[in-house]
Amino acid sequence: MPKESLRNLDGFKIFHYKTIDSTQKEIWRRFKNKTIKDKTMIIADIQTAGIGTHGRIWHTDEENNIAFSVYFDFSKKNCRVDELDGLTVRIAKKIVSIFKEMYDIDLDIKFPNDIYCNGKKLGGILTESKVQNGLVRCVVIGIGINTNQVEFA
């Protein structure tokens, strides 16, 4: 079982796992079981089968990566699918600005979801949603950043 954070981050419910197959998969399991609430965040030290784009696996080692997924409930927002256009790129731009502001590191974006540093892939963003009758029911945003990863599959 995960450790549940004792404090919330602006209303986020945070669950931390030492090891998990995938933070994204855990969000979807909770969604399927109807045990998830808006602004639920799943964080893991180690992912054994993290999800990348195009069915790729996103590997994470302990203390060498940042891996988390966040669930947003849109069921009461009447949000059309087209309103999510560009969401992944906006998230990527925000990550780039955070790294610049906090660490004075210049990062690049490889459209639409990859983050690069000095020509090497540093991380990525996976945005998934459930849509019903043209309206977004929920959005799950997964972010993986390699901070000190040495070995890659």
PLM-predicted stretches and their roles:
Residues 13, 39-41, 66, 108, ...:
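Structural motif
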Residues 134-153:
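Short, acidic (Asp/Glu-rich) active-site segment that either coordinates a divalent metal cofactor
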Residues 1-101:
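N-terminal lobe of the biotin/lipoate ligase/transferase fold
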Residues 73-75, 130-132, 148-150:
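Short coil/turn motifs at secondary-structure junctions
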Residues 21, 48, 117, 145-147:
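Short, glycine/acidic-enriched loop or turn micro-motifs at the edges of active sites
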